[in-house]
């Protein structure tokens, strides 16, 4: 943040990861109009190590989502593959339930709704905070599921993906 303050933040600037975001930092993010691209899958994948190795008073500040969104900070998700699992559904589920791989809760106040978690992956590469649309002239990027969204909300998992289409071309099909 100090580098952005010194150099001057510009539209589109963002911080990747934002692993630890204490309340005072949220104010600075808003002041500089910086967005965050974070990886909630690390709560699931590495959360038990965080609980063990990071001071308890910092646990509420790890991979925050809900607090940032409520404050008005733009937030998008990534997986940080290959350092994190490449499956975006792991990240979405972790943002919703905030459970570690062993089932411990970490930052439960940072939970978000399933549809909000999905939207955090729907931005464009150049502008991850603006949702892409399905309309004439836009790239045909689609993910077809094997059950209705209302049912998927209770079981966020890549096992429900039937087909993935990028730029109108099938790049994955379960059939």
Predicted segments with their positions:
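Short, small/polar residue-rich loop motifs at catalytic or cofactor-binding pockets
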Residues: 157-159
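His/Asp/Glu-enriched, well-ordered alpha-helical/loop segment
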Residues: 1-13, 18, 23-147, 164-165
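Short, Lys/Arg- and Gly-enriched loop/turn segments at beta-strand edges
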Residues: 149-155
């Amino acid at each position: 943040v100090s580098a952005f303050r010194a150099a001057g933040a510009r539209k589109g600037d963002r911080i990747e990861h934002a692993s630890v975001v204490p309340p005072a930092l949220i104010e600075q993010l808003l002041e500089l109009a910086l967005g965050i691209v974070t990886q909630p899958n690390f709560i699931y994948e590495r959360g038990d190590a965080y609980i063990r190795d990071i001071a308890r008073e910092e646990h509420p500040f790890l991979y925050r989502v809900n607090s940032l969104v409520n404050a008005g900070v733009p937030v998008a998700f990534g997986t940080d593959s290959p350092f994190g699992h490449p499956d975006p559904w792991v990240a979405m589920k972790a943002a919703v339930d905030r459970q570690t791989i062993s089932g411990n809760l970490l930052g439960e106040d940072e939970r978000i709704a399933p549809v909000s978690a999905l939207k955090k992956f729907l931005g464009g590469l150049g502008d991850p905070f603006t949702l892409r649309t399905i309309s004439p002239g836009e790239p045909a990027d689609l993910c077809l599921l094997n059950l209705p969204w209302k049912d998927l909300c209770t079981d966020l998992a890549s096992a429900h993906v039937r087909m993935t289409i990028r730029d109108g071309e099938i790049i994955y099909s379960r059939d």
